[in-house]
Structures are given as structure tokens and as C-alpha cells.
Amino acid sequence: MVQERLTSTVANAVGARIVGGEFRPGDSMRLDELEAEFGVSRSVSREAVKILESLGLVRSRRRVGVIVQPMGEWNVMAPQVIQWQLQGPN
């Protein structure tokens, strides 16, 4: 239960930053960076990335990290993506 909330918190924070333009297409981040920033375990950061991947916002690449995808790859009809767009500065 706690892990699910942590996963949601990380996914929501990173997703909002991607949709808000803080991360640009092609930008990369590593799991260890997410772990350090949010103070979470590797499994929590992996699950958060899986959520973002399922929405088309990022793609994981071995030895490269997590790459932000262009907006054309996003599932813009997903409720979470719509929510992040409405909350964002744009």
C-alpha cells in the first residue's frame, strides 16, 4: 500500500514535469537520480517509470536511462496526461 502511494507520487511528479516542459524530448534521467531525488527504492522508481512508459511519456533504454519521448508518442487521451496538461504552466 505504501509502495503504491510512493510509486504514484513519483510518477505524478515526473509526469507533470515532462508534460510541463521541464524535461524535453530526448532528455534522459537515470533510476538512481529518481531514487535520490524522491528518497525511494529502486523498485518504486522502476514501477513509476513503467507507468510513464505505459502513457508513452518515456522509454527505458539499457545503459542509457529513461528517455523522454516526443509529444507525438504520448497517450494524450489518458486521464493522467490530461490532468498534468491542465495543471501545467502552458
Model segments located where?
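Short linear motifs at protein or domain termini
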Residues: 1-90
